[in-house]
């Protein structure tokens, strides 16, 4: 497949980014939301592991480069409007169930309960010990 062709079909935003959802392939759990630029999406397809674009750092973010929580990519999908990417992944590493920098399985651990956001999923590992 021509790399330029499939990347050209993505509707990038004004900053050259596309939103990305990482979903656990085995369970269907939504793990996280992030951004990719063209280079990150191409690298993800090439390497078979998630590479995102960090807007705060202004550079590629190889998921797991600091935490060890790598995401092996099984499938890359583009939504019907071509403006959102879905990665179906297996979360790997020394704590394979952790995708979030807070030490939780998913970044979506807050639930609206009685008009307030409440953390409803447990911390699996203290983030202080993950990011040394």
Swiss-Prot record:
Enzyme class, first EC level, given as a word: hydrolase
Positions with a binding annotation for Zn(2+): 80, 100, 107
Binding site residues for Mg(2+): 79, 81, 83
GO annotations of cellular component type: cytoplasm
GO biological process: L-histidine biosynthetic process
EC number(s) from the headed UniProt entry: 3.5.4.19
Record InterPro entries: PRA-CH, PRib_AMP_CycHydrolase_dom, PRib_AMP_CycHydrolase_sf
Glycoprotein in keyword set: no
Keyword set includes Cytoplasm: yes
Biological pathway: Amino-acid biosynthesis; L-histidine biosynthesis; L-histidine from 5-phospho-alpha-D-ribose 1-diphosphate: step 3/9
Subcellular compartments: Cytoplasm
GO MF annotation terms: magnesium ion binding; phosphoribosyl-AMP cyclohydrolase activity; zinc ion binding
Cofactor: how bound: Binds 1 Mg(2+) ion per subunit. Binds 1 zinc ion per subunit.
Swiss-Prot/TrEMBL keywords: Amino-acid biosynthesis, Cytoplasm, Histidine biosynthesis, Hydrolase, Magnesium, Metal-binding, Zinc
Reactions the enzyme catalyzes: 1-(5-phospho-beta-D-ribosyl)-5'-AMP + H2O = 1-(5-phospho-beta-D-ribosyl)-5-[(5-phospho-beta-D-ribosylamino)methylideneamino]imidazole-4-carboxamide
The protein's required cofactors: Mg(2+); Zn(2+)
HAMAP family in UniProt: HisI (MF_01021)
Subunit architecture: Homodimer.
Biological role stated in the UniProt entry: Catalyzes the hydrolysis of the adenine ring of phosphoribosyl-AMP.
Family, per entry: Belongs to the PRA-CH family.
Name the UniProt record assigns to this protein: Phosphoribosyl-AMP cyclohydrolase
